[in-house]
Amino acid sequence: GAARYSRTINIPKDWKKKPVELFLERTRPTWVYVDGELVDSCNFISTPQRYLLPKKVKPGKHLLEIVVDNGRGVPEQVYGSSHAYTEDTQTNWNGIIGRIELQLVGSVESKSAETPAGAISSSSVVPLVGAIPSRSVASSTALQMLDFAKDFHIEGAHFYANGHRIFLRGKHDAAVWPLTGHVEMSVEGWMKYLGTCKEYGINHVRFHSWCPPEAAFLAADSLGVYLQPELPFWGSFDKKDEKLMTFLHQEGVNILREYGHHPSFHMMALGNELWGDIDKMKEFVDDFRKI
C-alpha cells in the first residue's frame, strides 16, 4: 500500500535560479509533492529516481512529501515474479533506502557522455559535464580520465575479458537479506559480501530477476568480481502486453545507463527462466546492445 513520508526542506539562498534535483537511490513507485503540489511520479525500481524541482521553488523552507506505494505503479507480473519484489527473500518493503538527497546539478541537458559501443582505443578522453551529482555551482565542469577498457567476448568454448581467458565460477543471488528485509546499500557491506564470495573461489554473481545498487558495482570493481544484473521479471514475454513490455524495456535502459560503465558490469539478462515471444526478446537485446 501507500505510505507518505514528509520533511521540511531548506533551499539555500545561493541555489537561487539553479536546477535542484531530488535524488532517491532505491525505492518503489513514488509521487513527489512540494508544498502540496504534485511535481511528478516515477516507477523506476532498479535504479535511482530523480526529480527536477519546479523553478518556482525558491530558496527558503518548503514541505517535501513523497508517497511510496509498494502495491501499484508496476505491472502485476512483477510483484509475484521477481526478486525485486518477492516476499520470499528481501520482502516487498516500503520506503526509500540508500541516499536521499537534494542535489544542485549542472546542466540538465549534459549529464552524461557516450562513446560508441564496442569501440576501444588505446587512449580516449571523454569530458563528463555534470555527470557526477555535485553541490557546486551550476557552471562547474568535471573532466575525468577513463583509463580502463572493457571487452568481454567468447572464443570457441571460452570467455575472454580484456584479452585474458577467464573461468566464471558463479553464484545465484536472490536478494536474500534476512537481517534488514531489504538489499544492502553500502560499499562496506558489499565489500564484505563479495569478499566472502572470493574467499570461496567465487568470481561471478548472477542477480536473479533484480539489479543491485551502485555500491555493489563499486565493491565489485575493487575486488575484481563479475556481476550479472537482470530485469525484474520471471515469466512470459508477451508482446501484446504493452504495459509490461514498456516497463521492462525502460528498466533495462535505466540499468545500462546507470551502471553499465562499471568494469564489473559484464553481463545482463532479460530475467529468469523466460518464455514467450523470442522475437521480442531479440528486439530487447538488440536495443540494449546499442546503449
Across the structure, where does each feature detected by a protein language model lie?
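Extended acidic/polar, glycine-enriched regions
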Residues: 55-63, 117, 136-155
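Residue-level structural signal for beta-strand termini and adjacent loop
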Residues: 42-44, 147, 171-172, 271
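Intrinsic disorder/low-complexity segments
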Residues: 107-144
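Active-site mouth of glycoside hydrolases
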Residues: 73-75, 88-90, 154-291
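Short intrinsically disordered coil segments
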Residues: 23, 81, 113-115, 145, ...
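Short, cationic motifs built from Arg/Lys/His that form the positively charged side of catalytic pockets
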Residues: 6-7, 145-146, 150, 206, ...
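Low-complexity, Pro/Ser/Thr- and charge-rich linker/hinge segments at domain boundaries
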Residues: 88-99, 106-113, 145-161
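Accessory beta-strand-rich segments of carbohydrate-active enzymes
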Residues: 1-107, 174, 213-214, 223-228
